[in-house]
Amino acid sequence: MIVPRLALPISLALQRVSRRVAEHPHNLRILQRHMSSVYFRSGAIKPKPEEMPFGLLAIFCAVIPGLFVGATISKNVANFLEENDLFVPADDDDDED
């Protein structure tokens, strides 16, 4: 159901782009430059970029400590708010199951 809804706008957009390219051939060069990061000016394909070894481990080493620091900060703020009577959760709110 979603695909037919998207098919018409996509086809209309492609028709507009093809009309613009047909009217002004220099627009084709602009479109080609947009995708030129894969190719050299000579047309040769650039080599595959180097992958970082242990990239997934580096992500975990950055995300996990961030989660713990965020949880600690939020716990301390919640305790501060409750100690100073700025926000005290009501016990009767938990019985609404």
Swiss-Prot record:
One Pfam family here: DDDD
Membrane-spanning ranges: 53-73
Null mutant phenotype: RNAi-mediated knockdown in muscle results in mitochondrial calcium uptake defects.
Gene Ontology annotations of biological process type: calcium import into the mitochondrion; defense response to Gram-negative bacterium; mitochondrial calcium ion homeostasis; mitochondrial calcium ion transmembrane transport; positive regulation of innate immune response
InterPro entries assigned: MCU_reg (IPR018782)
Membrane topology: Single-pass membrane protein
The keyword Nucleotide-binding is assigned to this record: no
Cell compartments where the protein resides: Mitochondrion inner membrane
Record bears the keyword Oxidoreductase: no
Transit peptide (first-last residue): 1-35
GO MF annotation list: calcium channel activity
One GO CC term, this protein: uniplex complex
Keyword terms, alphabetized: Calcium, Calcium transport, Ion transport, Membrane, Mitochondrion, Mitochondrion inner membrane, Transit peptide, Transmembrane, Transmembrane helix, Transport
Family classification: Belongs to the SMDT1/EMRE family.
Function: Essential regulatory subunit of the mitochondrial calcium uniporter MCU channel, a protein that mediates calcium uptake into mitochondria.
Protein name stated in the entry: Essential MCU regulator, mitochondrial
Chain's gene name: EMRE
